[in-house]
Amino acid sequence: MAINTSNLCSLLFLLSLFLLSTTVSLAESEFDRQEYEECKRQCMQLETSGQMRRCVSQCDKRFEEDIDWSKYDNQEDPQTECQQCQRRCRQQESGPRQQQYCQRRCKEICEEEEEYNRQRDPQQQYEQCQKHCQRRETEPRHMQTCQQRCERRYEKEKRKQQKRYEEQQREDEEKYEERMKEEDNKRDPQQREYEDCRRRCEQQEPRQQHQCQLRCREQQRQHGRGGDMMNPQRGGSGRYEEGEEEQSDNPYYFDERSLSTRFRTEEGHISVLENFYGRSKLLRALKNYRLVLLEANPNAFVLPTHLDADAILLVIGGRGALKMIHHDNRESYNLECGDVIRIPAGTTFYLINRDNNERLHIAKFLQTISTPGQYKEFFPAGGQNPEPYLSTFSKEILEAALNTQTEKLRGVFGQQREGVIIRASQEQIRELTRDDSESRHWHIRRGGESSRGPYNLFNKRPLYSNKYGQAYEVKPEDYRQLQDMDLSVFIANVTQGSMMGPFFNTRSTKVVVVASGEADVEMACPHLSGRHGGRGGGKRHEEEEDVHYEQVRARLSKREAIVVLAGHPVVFVSSGNENLLLFAFGINAQNNHENFLAGRERNVLQQIEPQAMELAFAAPRKEVEESFNSQDQSIFFPGPRQHQQQSPRSTKQQQPLVSILDFVGF
């Protein structure tokens, strides 16, 4: 009896070795049905029922583990994994035990899918998927397969979400462009007819194109005069309406369609004006500069970023807060209307609208340093859009640099998906704008030569002021932060119907933008005269040409701009139904002066000796003096319509000047 027991133990030992070798073999290849049957047959040779049950259970377990579950997982469309898994079980698994295990796994997949679909955010879906893997998988190999499936789902959902976001952005852009076209057509119903006429001219031979375009302009001119005769209430005289019709030929004029939306969310948008040098070579002095307009809703937060450009900010309306990171030091400033502040290139900064009711409007003038006329934003934080630049580094680099696991980083980078301008709670706004003891520069002296804080234009006396208008300007000698950029910032408020100028800048070229109201602009330009034939006629040598200046006209509305080159005489007329508010950024500002060509004071023509004026005009001295010395006002004057309508006794009825300090935004 002892011998039989010994033989049985030996047999069981050999069988265990056989089963172990079979397990290793089966783990390395797809499960073989014949081997499974052989495994069960060997179990049947054992003497006790308990041994047989345990042996068969081991065979079943190996069978379950060696099913290739990847063939039941749809890697491309996780939404249909449940149905496809069940269908493949019915098609490919014939044995009842195989069907049982296959259906059980499919049920788990279906439950996972149901819970997965309840989550809308890819990051939440990913986390839920990982929990399922940890809960139901015990074998490392299966755990890895499950986690890989989670990764594939996560990446696919991210791509789908990004695609939806981009489609929504395009839809918003198209609606915005369509709305702008509708507004433009309402403002200028004859523009389409003029553009059609010009397109027909372009189809003609080159010799005939110029005459054809002149005919188009003449037709528009006649339409404009006719419109004034039929509707005498229409703003401006006939000659001012002509400028509106010729704006498409004006390289200095930028309408609102010249603004492209850089970022747009429900809480605000950032727009950038067309590249100056890309518009015309006449604007080559501005090839390194760009104009950006920002608008943010109450309690909005603009994500941290840095630019590869130096920036000068002007607060047009609202109340904000600016945080700038200089190396390892944070500087914090409250911003008010009229504040000017510089953000050096590479400085990480972020903005907050700290007002509960009013929108924040900021104009930024950028001096590019990497690529002329081109700049980029770099966001350290974000999610889907903007994508944080940190996410472009490999996970090994990020783990080493931040000493943080990839799973945690993925959770951080995947959360924000509302865009560049987002809404913050009032509690968050209070926390962001409170007097932070760690910030050594909170409310440092405002303005001044040595300050890095904001300089407020309205803290100084107006540069020019009378009942027809006010002007304020900060120059490099006033604010040290403007010196190495050689820029100036200018704001003017012109009362309804009044005008500023004519005048010219001695050195500075300025980008002038309408913040409120409407402006009729006229400028004398010697560069455009050759394009229309000039008065000289023929192609003669440059120094032999007759001197001729083209009259450049433009009708500017809110958010539209015009470039005034140095030396070019210009005049701005407030032509709308409200006061005109202008702001301007000027380059080459050091030692620049405005030379006015009319008025009792600051009039350069009055400084020319009477004999010289008499010789220059070839007219009697008395007539010259009467022509140039009759204006009692300076800088700001009654406009053309006021001049025609007002008698000397009615000057007291002039609309009173509304202070520029009363203006609160676009």
UniProtKB/Swiss-Prot annotation:
Residues 161-191, 219-254, 629-655 are annotated as: Disordered. GO terms for biological process: defense response to bacterium; defense response to fungus; killing of cells of another organism. InterPro entries: Cupin_1, RmlC-like_jellyroll, RmlC_Cupin_sf, Seed_Storage-Functional, Vicilin_N. It is found in: Secreted. Residues 642-655 have a biased composition (Low complexity). It comes from Macadamia integrifolia (Macadamia nut). The gene is AMP2-1. Residues 271-410, 455-625 form the Cupin type-1 domain. Keywords: Antibiotic, Antimicrobial, Fungicide, Plant defense, Secreted, Seed storage protein, Signal, Storage protein. Belongs to the 7S seed storage protein family. One of its GO terms (molecular function) is nutrient reservoir activity. Pfam families: Cupin_1, Vicilin_N. Residues 1-27 form the signal peptide. This is Vicilin-like antimicrobial peptides 2-1. Antimicrobial peptides 2b, 2c and 2d have antibacterial and antifungal activity against a range of species. GO terms for cellular component: extracellular region.
